[in-house]
UniProtKB/Swiss-Prot annotation:
GO BP terms, alphabetized: L-tryptophan biosynthetic process
Keyword Zinc in annotation: no
Protein name: N-(5'-phosphoribosyl)anthranilate isomerase
Listed GO MF terms: phosphoribosylanthranilate isomerase activity
Family: Belongs to the TrpF family.
Keywords noted in UniProt: Amino-acid biosynthesis, Aromatic amino acid biosynthesis, Isomerase, Tryptophan biosynthesis
Gene3D superfamilies for this protein: Aldolase class I
The organism's place on the tree of life at top rank: Eukaryota
């Protein structure tokens, strides 16, 4: 099970997450958001993540993957991240390809997460790092999320992504079973419910931000509990 702690704004929270066993540290680069990280802090987080890495960097990891079909591709990605990580993730929303690539160059994040209405066919080939794409499961184009090689991993989130709104897990589990889906799950996860989330069909990773905060600030106890319960 992959664990991603998102919305990290400083190296101290990243340290707690990594020591607890997190595989990915997410940072928000969308301007003007409460969780937007300063570039100087992001560089510190990336440096820390790199110091903990067990193996390949992100581009080496992507190049090492063998073209697969359907769930096999995403299971391969899961195994590679687990054995080589941890990795840093930069989250972007409806920002230009040029802006994203500039931040990649400046901060040297490992993965890009597209969280808006970007054209995946346009963006993914032009971005300089592997891409995690966010989907809302009730979208008509959600089957795009199952296409291997187009992106690193699909992330299923609620329509109000980043606001702690929980998906309909029952419907998602049924849909995933029918389509043999593999995905990261976000939306309303907490230390108290993540043990149920990891049992859903198709879940190979969990992604949390607000669920490990108290009054809008990362809560180290909640981070530790979330990772522990996700990896049980």
């Amino acid at each position: 099970m992959l664990v991603k702690i998102c919305g990290v704004k400083d190296v101290e929270a990243a340290q707690v997450a990594l020591e607890s066993g997190a595989d990915m540290i997410g940072m928000i680069f969308v301007p003007g958001k409460p969780r937007t990280i300063q570039v100087s802090n992001a560089k510190e987080v990336v440096s820390l993540v790199e110091s903990k890495r067990k193996g390949l960097n992100s581009n080496e990891l992507y190049d090492s993957l063998k073209p697969g079909q359907d769930s096999l591709w995403f299971e391969q990605v899961h195994d590679s991240i687990k054995s080589n990580g941890p990795y840093s993730v930069g989250v972007f929303r409806n920002q230009s390809i040029e802006e994203i690539n500039n931040i990649i160059e400046e901060v040297d994040i490992d993965f890009v997460q597209l969280h808006g209405q970007e054209s995946h066919d346009e963006y993914i080939p032009q971005l300089k790092k592997p891409v995690i794409t966010r989907f809302v499961p009730n979208e008509t184009k959600v089957l795009q999320s199952l296409k291997p090689n187009k992106h690193l991993l699909p992330l299923f989130d609620s329509e109000a992504g980043g606001e702690g709104v929980k998906l309909n897990w029952s419907n998602l589990s049924d849909w995933s079973a029918k389509n043999n889906a593999r995905y990261l799950l976000a939306g309303g996860l907490t230390p108290d419910n993540v043990h149920e989330a990891i049992k859903l069909d198709g879940v190979i990773g969990v992604d949390v931000s607000g669920g490990v905060e108290t009054n809008g600030v990362k809560d180290y106890v909640k981070i530790k509990e979330f990772v522990k319960n996700a990896l049980q």
